[in-house]
A protein has these predicted regions:
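Bacterial Sec-dependent signal peptides at the C-terminal "C-region" and cleavage site
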Residues: 18-30
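Primary mode marks residue(s) on the alpha4-beta5-alpha5 output face of response regulator receiver
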Residues: 27-172
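Bacterial N-terminal signal peptides that target proteins for export
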Residues: 1-9
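Bacterial N-terminal signal peptides
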Residues: 8-19
């Protein structure tokens, strides 16, 4: 809330200096990260990822292709990993993990996760072009670099944020 208040004050000062009144629309739009702020190249790559993973809205398809339940993470959802895809490469069209939420009438695909073992590289691997996205280091179990993308459920924290406030914080 503090950053939003500071932001609101800055907007008001700018509006006074520019001679216009602040509006609710401009304040709330600026307070939310938007996909539109990503580069054209990044948006193109996200479209490739969506096209490649759209088939996994049908969970049976993901199951048939080797994605298996790993765990539930509050704010991330139910994570299914295809272990045959875990290697030393970042492949936009073949995410190592899929994130689902259970809406009571089946699973809903909400995002993907790219995974590169730390044994492959001591520094974060390359990711989406033209972004300042930081891979997350996870040391539990197999030490990995992880990069999440909220492809199918908008995340007000940002496309590549670790957690999505729209995803339940409690696991079943």
């Amino acid at each position: 809330m503090k950053s939003f208040s500071t932001f609101s004050i800055l907007i008001a000062i700018c509006c006074v200096l520019l001679g216009s009144a602040p509006t609710t629309r401009s304040t709330s739009a600026a307070a939310k990260p938007a996909v539109e702020n990503l580069s054209a190249v990044t948006n193109h790559e996200l479209a490739l990822a969506r096209n490649a993973t759209a088939k996994y809205h049908d969970f049976d398809r993901a199951d048939d292709e080797g994605y298996e339940f790993l765990h539930c993470v509050p704010g991330e959802g139910l994570e299914y990993v295809n272990w045959s895809l875990v290697d030393c490469t970042f492949d936009i069209e073949h995410p190592e993990a899929l994130h689902y939420i259970d809406e009571g009438n089946g699973l809903r695909l909400v995002g993907v996760e790219y995974v590169v073992p730390v044994a492959c590289t001591a520094t974060p691997p390359e990711g989406f072009t033209g972004t300042d996205v930081e891979w997350e280091f996870e040391a539990e179990g197999l030490p990995i670099w992880a990069l999440r993308a909220a492809l199918w459920l908008p995340n007000r924290e940002g496309m590549f944020a670790e957690h999505n406030p729209s995803i339940p914080t409690q696991c079943p």
